[in-house]
């Protein structure tokens, strides 16, 4: 299957991959998702590229067409339809497809669409039980009866970007950061949001500084892709490295509270050490 000559304009996702060896990790190629003639494709490239516009189409291999059913679930009348004209302070969350090559070979080739549907149901519940420290959901963006994205309120910045614009690892940041601005109210906001989720029988399961937005001094919890009901399995549920206990395999309230404590230590409050191993 040939690729378009102006591939750079149609590349949706690119990600370098690495494989482990006795001598450490080594570069194994670049994964790419691109659009051609209205269809989406997943491919692998042999080289590194600084920009999608530099992609050498002759390097494309393992090309797979991604069926719509793999990433866009069917819209149901029970769901909220997003406004046709979205507010300026909003954005559309669309599914990431960079791992589709692996997913397509598994037992759940439509798991991306299933995960989108799961997150929609979580947001619909949260919409009925709104809270100032939980992201505002505006509804589903729909095309031809399929959910193409989730429309959400947009917030200025993450807690991670505010505290750690240099993307230092959390231990190095903790050891070098001088505590200045008071973030106790932010921690209280995060806890209020967590407690609200727990009152609904939900656990976020991925509380970390990149999933906390800051808006006029208020903390808002975002990204409910890993959110599960209390007691549910966390098998195949994505969580953020360094911010969760890898031994925990089920959705427990303590998962969120432990992550909140990790953020508190990360912000420099107290002398405790980090719980989660790098």
Regions found by a protein language model. Name each.
Residues 197-215:
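Catalytic-loop of the protein kinase fold
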Residues 186-187:
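Activation segment signature within eukaryotic-like protein kinase domains
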Residues 34-128:
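ATP-binding glycine-rich loop module of kinase domains
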Residues 215-278:
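C-lobe/activation-segment region of protein kinase-like
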Residues 1-60:
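Long, solvent-exposed N-terminal ectodomains/accessory regions
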Residues 91, 96-115, 124-127, 135-181:
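Conserved structural core of kinase catalytic domains
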Residues 190-197:
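Conserved hydrophobic alpha-helix
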């Amino acid at each position: 299957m040939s690729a378009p000559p102006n591939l750079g304009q149609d590349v949706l996702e690119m990600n370098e991959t690495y494989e482990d060896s006795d001598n450490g990790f080594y570069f194994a190629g670049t994964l790419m998702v691109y659009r051609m003639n209205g269809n989406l494709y997943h491919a692998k490239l042999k080289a590194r590229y600084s920009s999608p516009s530099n992609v050498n189409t002759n390097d494309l291999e393992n090309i797979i067409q991604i069926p719509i059913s793999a990433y866009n679930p069917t819209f149901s009348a029970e769901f909220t339809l997003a406004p046709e004209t979205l507010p300026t302070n909003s954005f559309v969350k669309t599914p990431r497809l960079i791992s589709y090559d692996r997913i397509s070979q598994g037992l759940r080739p439509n798991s991306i669409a299933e995960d989108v549907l799961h997150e929609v149901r979580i947001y619909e519940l949260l919409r009925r039980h709104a809270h100032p420290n939980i992201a505002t959901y505006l509804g589903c963006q729909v095309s031809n009866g399929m959910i193409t994205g989730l429309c959400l309120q947009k917030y200025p910045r993450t807690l991670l970007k505010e505290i750690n614009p240099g993307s230092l690892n959390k231990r190095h940041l903790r050891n070098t950061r001088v505590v200045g601005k008071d973030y106790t109210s932010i921690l209280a906001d995060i806890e209020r949001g967590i407690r609200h989720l727990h009152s609904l029988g939900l656990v976020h399961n991925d509380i970390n500084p990149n999933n906390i937005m800051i808006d006029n001094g208020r903390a808002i919890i975002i990204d409910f892709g890993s959110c599960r009901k209390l007691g549910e399995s966390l098998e195949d549920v994505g969580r953020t490295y360094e911010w969760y206990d890898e031994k925990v395999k089920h959705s427990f309230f303590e998962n969120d509270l432990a992550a909140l404590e990790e953020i508190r230590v990360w912000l420099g409050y107290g002398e405790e050490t980090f719980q989660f191993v790098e």
